[in-house]
Amino acid sequence: MFTVFLLVVLTITVVSFPSDRASDGRDDEAKDERSDMYKSKRNGRCCHPACGKHFSCGR
């Protein structure tokens, strides 16, 4: 029974570790201050649909 427990814990650890690492690279743009949702003081542009009605996209 203890062996089964260890196998389950090991499997969960191995499966969750790569998915956590992979998500870090995809979130870089979302963490960047200069992404589409960031309100730029210089030009007032925003290309995200949530703020598009208040700001021009400029593309």
Curated annotation (Swiss-Prot):
InterPro entries: Conotoxin_a-typ, Conotoxin_a-typ_CS. Residues 17-42 form a propeptide. Belongs to the conotoxin A superfamily. GO terms for molecular function: acetylcholine receptor inhibitor activity; ion channel regulator activity; toxin activity. Expressed by the venom duct. The keyword Signal applies. It comes from Conus catus (Cat cone). Residues 1-16 form the signal peptide. Disulfide bonds join C46-C51, C47-C57. This is Alpha-conotoxin CIA. GO terms for cellular component: extracellular region; host cell postsynaptic membrane. The cysteine framework is I (CC-C-C). Alpha3/5 pattern.
